A protein has these predicted regions:
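Short, intrinsically disordered N-terminal pre-domain segments
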Residues: 1-9
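Short, surface-exposed, charged amphipathic helix/loop patches that serve as local interaction elements
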Residues: 13-16, 20-119
């Protein structure tokens, strides 16, 4: 499968969806779900969870797309929100969704979010 991340380069990354890639995708998603559950944790545990979230996102992108040095540096210069968007898109692509489905889902989520904010 071909995945292009314009925020990092013009290169199209060829990703073969192997068991390793799928396993790493699921590990990434699990770590993100676990990092959301920090409400009843100590401040130190919350910091560790935040650091883990940053590392999990960047490591997932680097390893899945096999980024080169210049792309890794660009990734490190992005905001955390941009990095999460990229990681989420890559994970969904690995799981079989196409770009159009992902974009449509994101638009629906944004519309729902703005509705909730209006109420």
């Amino acid at each position: 499968m071909k995945i292009k991340v314009s925020q990092l380069s013009n290169r199209v990354h060829e990703v073969k969806v192997t068991n390793r890639i799928l396993r790493n995708t699921l590990k990434y998603q699990l770590s993100m779900a676990e990092s959301d559950d920090v409400e009843n944790k100590s401040f130190t545990e919350q910091l560790h969870a935040s650091l883990n979230a940053v590392n999990s996102n960047t490591d997932f992108i680097v390893n899945t797309l096999n980024l080169n040095k210049a792309e890794k540096e660009k990734l490190d210069d992005l905001s955390f929100a941009e990095t999460v968007k990229i990681a989420t898109r890559v994970a969904l692509r690995v799981q079989g969704l196409n770009d159009e489905d992902i974009d449509m889902s994101a638009k629906k989520a944004d519309a729902s979010k703005s509705k909730d904010e209006d109420n």
